[in-house]
Design a protein with these regions (language model features):
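Repetitive helical segments and hydrophobic/amphipathic motifs
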Residues: 13-16
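C-terminal motif of bacterial Sec signal peptides marking the signal peptidase cleavage site
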Residues: 19-22
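Long beta-strand-rich cores associated with HINT superfamily self-processing modules
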Residues: 86-234
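Intrinsically disordered, low-complexity polar/charged tails and linkers
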Residues: 29-86
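Bacterial N-terminal signal peptides that target proteins for export
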Residues: 1-10
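Intrinsically disordered, low-complexity regions of eukaryotic proteins
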Residues: 28-29, 157
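Polar/charged alpha-helical tracts
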Residues: 4, 33-43, 47, 61, ...
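Bacterial signal peptide processing site
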Residues: 24-26
């Protein structure tokens, strides 16, 4: 009797083991398929960004020229950054709105006109997606548009020259602004280092353990922004 019971138990264990192995194999297979599909979607979305980036840049340059401004070089989000953003937000690559992006730079007094011009031009071209005025408790403010194409959105930001200086390190902003304008802004802000706005933001965003540290850099960020153009929206 005990021998029969032992054989029965062994059979049950073997069957259960086979079932668990099968389930694990199915789970792994589904996970692999999902990962492969994500990489395919990523490839496709980044390919569409290459297609929709140039017309986005053309619109930005067209508007910038009408207002004696500048358009920054077209920029594409890296694959690594795109994948990280998707996994963090649990989103599809096609849901990201800034795989291709550029910025229109202008004098502070021209910002409203530039915003109106971008919206009008994009609407006429049939690619206007949305407009958003952004603010934060760190003193940062800015404006962005999303151009809506068939398979993907792209992004156009609008910044004053001073706020572009505040957001980007010298190796990025000096070539775009040119030496003359860069030096004017450098003098006007009292010789402050460019790009500290983004630098402080990255510290605040990455430090999730210390409220005191985040508050310290938040105050630094607010003080830094006070040397540049104030938000034009009251």
């Amino acid at each position: 009797m005990m021998r029969k019971m032992g054989k029965w138990m062994l059979a049950v264990i073997l069957v259960c083991g086979i079932s668990l192995t099968s389930c694990n194999r199915d789970d792994n297979s589904a996970s692999e398929q999902a990962g492969q599909q994500f990489q395919k979607d990523l490839d496709q979305a980044m390919s569409w960004a290459q297609v929709y980036g140039p017309p986005t840049q053309s619109l930005a340059e067209e508007v910038a020229a009408r207002h004696k401004g500048k358009a920054t070089p077209l920029n594409y989000k890296t694959r690594e950054s795109t994948e990280r953003k998707c996994r963090t937000d649990k989103s599809s690559p096609f849901e990201l709105r800034d795989l291709a992006r550029t910025t229109v730079l202008c004098e502070y007094d021209s910002i409203r006109n530039v915003i109106e011009d971008i919206e009008k031009t994009a609407t006429t071209s049939g690619i206007f997606g949305r407009y958003k005025h952004q603010t934060s408790d760190r003193g940062y403010w800015g404006d962005l548009f999303n151009m809506k194409f068939e398979y993907l959105y792209t992004e156009i930001q609008v910044k004053s020259y001073g706020n572009y200086y505040a957001a980007n390190p010298e190796e990025i902003c000096r070539p775009v602004l040119g030496d003359s304008l860069y030096n004017v802004i450098y003098t006007a802000c009292g010789g402050l280092e460019p790009g500290l706005s983004h630098h402080y933001y990255e510290i605040i965003r990455s430090d999730t353990t210390s409220d005191a540290t985040r508050e310290y850099y938040k105050k630094l960020c607010i003080e830094y922004h006070s040397h540049f153009d104030p938000d034009f929206v009251e």
